[in-house]
Amino acid sequence: MSVLPTPLANQLLIALPALSDPTFSRSVALICQHDENGAMGVLVNRPSEYTLGEVLSQMGIDTSDERLREQPVLSGGPVHPERGFVIHDDARAWDSSLEVGQGVYLTTSRDILEAMAAGDGPRNALVALGCAGWGAGQLEFELGENSWLTAPSDANVLFDTALEDRWQTAAGRIGVDLFRLTDYSGHA
């Protein structure tokens, strides 16, 4: 039986420059669940082709909040691209929520979107379509292959940093300048 390293839930997963997979190159993911069966996260720096207004309209939810309508919906990853995921900072009891850690939550139910449209939603929220998933041991293997860095989750990176700056900002929080790293790695 293998021993699971420290669970990575509530960590930011930061793609290293050598990671060439177009889905994950220069990406930042919030790891929402991690155990011996695998990991699940949501990419937090990839805009999709949709705005929140378009998604709400498709769901039959009206809002007069122009800022909310123009909010970009993120491409959260290649798994379940038809499902919505809301990362937020509101501890209210939504129909389907998971506390990721330190005041950050993941909700997958319609009620949070209805509350947001009515002006009664979380103060900070990211909406994504799809998520990223790793099978048992897969994320640990990729970390060992130097594909990713990890950093503690940071509300400023998630909610206050521009999408295009999140990759470099997340790494900078742990003292890493990604532009000074090479795009290849070795093993001793």
UniProtKB/Swiss-Prot annotation:
GO CC entries: cytosol
Cross-referenced Gene3D superfamilies: VC0467-like
Pfam family, one: DUF179
Family according to the record: Belongs to the UPF0301 (AlgH) family.
Protein name: UPF0301 protein XCC2748
Originating organism: Xanthomonas campestris pv. campestris (strain ATCC 33913 / DSM 3586 / NCPPB 528 / LMG 568 / P 25)
